[in-house]
A protein has these predicted regions:
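Class I S-adenosyl-L-methionine
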Residues: 1-122, 235
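Short hydrophobic alpha-helical segments that form membrane-spanning helices or hydrophobic packing faces
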Residues: 31-33, 130-133, 187-188
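Short, solvent-exposed amphipathic alpha-helical segments in soluble enzyme
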Residues: 34-38, 60-63, 108-111, 137, ...
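Short gly/pro/ser/thr-enriched loop/turn and capping motifs at secondary-structure boundaries
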Residues: 53-54, 74-75, 126-130, 147-150, ...
Length: 277
């Protein structure tokens, strides 16, 4: 098991280690408090400058080394991290979104562990969460949909056969489709095998950035709208019965909050708290 940076961290200081931090979708105020603290204390910051806005670096110390990694290979990035930590420096590796999704965390973690470099992972808000918040939409609407699938369509990197988009779409869950704008015709065809053509979906571009745009269109228009807006990257698709459910007054609600349901923290017939004074 890789050593955690916190296992060797002196009080009130960052130890020489790598801190892999999720920056969130783009808005500087959507990074976690822990992530912001690590950024403000690090000796070195390696950030994906093609996906992370420079505003997120506002609190980085002036003397800290800042390295954009958009033009670097994974091997070069790992070499930099290992070199700086062995030079007794603390390193923040700043990723867009959440490190657990499409971030090369697996490869970086293995390489750091092999080099006996301690590292810590700090989660971030993902684009699907930020998009749902902008849409004021819950993706798990009672009696409508209770599962969320995060996936992508096969492109340069193939997905396993069991995870082909058509197979996942058969569940008709809330499906969050990443990294697929360049293959949108194929994606739409696979989705139409299982979802209604007139079901509203959301096309989300540069979620969390100042130029964020979100369009809601019928599924049958997903590819056409993508081409009209010339979207080829930083695009997320939300395909979910929940989007339509939020525009309907069908009475769907959670059993947990019904007055007739009691549990450990809310006995039945619990009175509503009164306003103080």
């Amino acid at each position: 098991m890789p050593q955690s940076a916190t296992d060797v961290q002196p009080q009130n200081a960052l130890s020489p280690a790598v801190y892999i931090v999720g920056a969130g979708p783009g808005a500087p105020d959507l990074i976690t408090v822990r992530g912001q603290r690590l950024l403000s204390q690090a000796d070195v910051v390696l950030y994906a400058n093609s996906l992370v806005p420079t505003e997120l670096l506002a609190d980085v110390r002036p003397e800290a080394e800042q390295i954009g990694t958009a033009n670097l290979t994974l091997e070069q990035i790992v070499e930099l991290m290992v070199d700086r930590v062995r030079s007794q420096q603390s390193v923040v590796r700043l990723h867009d979104g959440d490190p657990s999704l499409y971030s090369a965390l697996y490869e970086q973690g293995r390489a750091l562990a092999a080099a006996e470099i301690p590292f810590e992972v700090v989660p971030g808000v993902s684009a699907f969460q930020a998009a749902a918040a902008t849409l004021q939409t819950e993706l798990t609407v009672p009696q409508q949909v209770q599962s969320i699938i995060l996936t992508r369509i096969s492109g340069r990197t193939q997905v396993p056969d069991a995870e082909e988009l058509g197979a996942l779409a058969a569940h008709r869950a809330s499906l969050c489709l990443y990294l697929s704008a360049r293959h949108v015709e194929n994606a739409q065809a696979r989705l139409l095998e299982h979802y209604p053509a007139d079901m509203l979906i959301a096309i989300c571009y540069r979620v969390g950035w100042p130029d964020e745009k979100i369009w809601q269109v019928p599924l049958a228009q997903m590819a056409a709208k993508t081409h009209t807006e010339r979207l080829i990257r930083t695009t997320l698709y939300l395909i979910s019965p929940a989007l339509a459910a939020h525009q309907q007054a069908d009475g769907s609600r959670s059993q947990l909050y019904r007055p007739s349901h009691s549990h450990l923290f809310r006995p039945q017939n619990q009175p509503t708290p009164r306003k103080p004074g």
